[in-house]
């Protein structure tokens, strides 16, 4: 029972962390041509993805 809860919690936290990191990179990628809050990250992503 406890291991099941722990497994579920771990799974949820992984999804949360992934979405937390993926969402800003997606939005930065979309705003590459505009002035972005973090231009160095944007430049890095733009360099990778054209």
Swiss-Prot record:
The modification N6-formyllysine is found at residues 29, 44, 48. Residues 1-27 form the signal peptide. Keywords: Amidation, Disulfide bond, Formylation, Ion channel impairing toxin, Mast cell degranulation, Neurotoxin, Potassium channel impairing toxin, Secreted, Signal, Toxin. The keyword Secreted applies. The keyword Nucleotide-binding does not apply. It holds the Pfam family Bee_toxin. The modification Asparagine amide is found at residue 49. Expressed by the venom gland. It is found in: Secreted. This is Mast cell degranulating peptide. It comes from Apis mellifera.
